[in-house]
Amino acid sequence: MRQEYHVSPQGRDMWEGSQEKPFATISRAAEEAEKGDVIVVHAGTYREWVKPKRGGSHPLNRVTFQAAAGEKVVIKGSEIVDNWSLVEGTVWKAVIPNKLFGEYNPYIQTIDGDWMIEPTGWKVHAGEVYLNGNAFYEARTLDDVKNPEVREYIVYPGDGHKEFYLNPQDTLYQWYAEVEAETTSIYANFQGADPNRELVEVNVRKCCFYPEKTGIDYITVKGFEMAHAATPWAPPTSEQYGMIGTHWSKGWIIENNIFHDSKCSAVSLGKEASTGEGLSYRYKQKSGYQHQLEAVFAGLKNGWSREKIGSHIVRNNTIYDCGQNGIVGNMGCAFSKIHGNHIYNIGIKHEFFGWEIAGIKFHAPIDTDITGNRIHHCTLGFWMDWQAQGTRISRNLLYQNDRDGNIEVTHGPLIIDNNIFASDYGFDNHAQGTAFVNNMICGRMYKVNILDRSTPYHLPHSTEVAGYSFVYGGDDRYFNNIFVGNQGKRAGNAFYGTNGYDGHTISYREFVKKAATGPGQDHENYTSVRQPVYMKHNVYLNGARAFAKETEQYTNCGFHPEILIEERADGVYLEFTMPKGITEILSENVNTEKLGDLIIADTVYDAPDGMPLLLGQDYFGNTRRRKSAPGPFDYLQEGKNRLKIW
């Protein structure tokens, strides 16, 4: 019979957990909860790591953790420190007994692991200091704390472009830690504030809500605020801790929460430790790439399947101010739905850099649906890496990111449709088999073949591995998109539009004929002959250029659409101008048949249940007319358009 437990700061853990005699901690309620039970948490701040002991048995028989209606409930991984002594100037020192941290001291734990690149010469730590909720910056030395310098930008290791800090003056608030046998001393520059009169908190716990055991299925978490987790680096070759995480389970619902200030990742749908734990970084015997290949098979042996792992729902959450990811996952994110989340300020402190940082970073998101999210002011909006097969990215809003998207070493089918990509740097396409349909793409793009890393593809709608392949580039589709250029200015190796595909074949028949009659031996011809691409009814403005063999397209190089994203108190608005004749450019909606078959994965673009797919909704979710406008909106008008988009 369903039981309802209550938790309140005024409660006692020795009480029965009723509304009249509530528990004092969420962890105490979690010890009692069985399938079907509900834990109602009342207003207050709970400084604990909640580790659910048991989950539900099926989607309708869950263990539910929820904030009481209309009440603010905060779970923090930090503790208050109020014993500061003045060192000199605006620098103060606090001495903390190590027993406060238990077995995990964030001021010893470094942010490192596979694919961690910077900083070099020293290590950033999982600890953090907060003044009235605002996070500081770790300093390399105590002298740097005493003499801080403003950090204005970092140079991105990928292509050398500059990424600027949003609030450079905040970088003057710095801290440094010294750890001894019994104590940890934290030095911090409070820039004139008295830390004994203000709220000062420091990271203590690794997570806020994360089960110790795997297989804790069908948990619901809703209505909470969580903050200040000392999460470690979360590459796909290690256990991926998050401030909240599913830990290799099935069927969680994480909804209507606020997550912020996780040192690395906020929400984890990731892998667990037995399938590999930073082996390349630790032992240097094999590359991270090789260990990640092994992790796929280890995951399959450890239950990775639609029946046992994934199928999570992460919706309507606000996620911000995290160092690595808003949402992260490898394998455990498969078959999931990521809907309606607002993700921003991810990776923008630039304290560390590695090849795993994005608002959403997934490996193997098989049949995962990413719809209706708003992602902005991130170093990278989304990154679909390895085995993004059956994945759909639809009706999302991305803007003011250093880069909107990256798709890497995956072979399709991947559908990207009805999105607004408004940042200056649009995409890195290091993949094949992607369909871009009805998007507005305002930034530059890069296309790269990957011929030194062969990655898996799967049987349709399954985790079962069907084979491996390099990324030859191509086998992509572009239908009904609006591309906006940079007025014809040079963009290095980047391109605006689809002219980066010039030289590709344009049909399966042409590709097969050239590969079959080439001069090379077997696989050599498939490296030299470019895979086909399919393009139709795209619009190219302001210097964006079309693929040389796209015959049905609209180009107006001199027309500037003057795209503007405006954030207002009542929402987000998009303003843009369209040229004359745009209302006459109509095309039929795209479906499974039109998208055709894929070369490497040897499958089609269909729905997760295997049924034919119709891309028949626009950005707003409205049903498109049988013939509708290019871009993410069913209706366009000549001249100025102004739309509320969030």
Regions from the PLM with identified roles:
Residues 41, 64-67, 219-221, 253-255, ...:
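All-beta strand scaffolds that present successive hydrophobic residues in beta-strands
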Residues 343, 358-360, 365-377, 382, ...:
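C-terminal structured domain segments across diverse proteins
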Residues 4-248, 260, 268, 274-304, ...:
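Extracellular polysaccharide-degrading/modifying enzymes targeting complex plant/algal/animal polysaccharides
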Residues 3, 37, 48, 61-63, ...:
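The right-handed parallel beta-helix/beta-solenoid scaffold, focusing on the short coil/turn
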Residues 399-403, 412-446, 456-487, 496-542:
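Catalytic-core region of carbohydrate-active enzymes that cleave or remodel glycosidic bonds
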Residues 262-265, 269-325, 330-359, 363-365:
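Hydrophobic, small-residue-rich alpha-helical packing segments that form membrane-like cores
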Residues 49-51, 206-208, 230-236, 241-242, ...:
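Short glycine/acidic-rich loop motifs that flank beta-strands on beta-rich extracellular proteins
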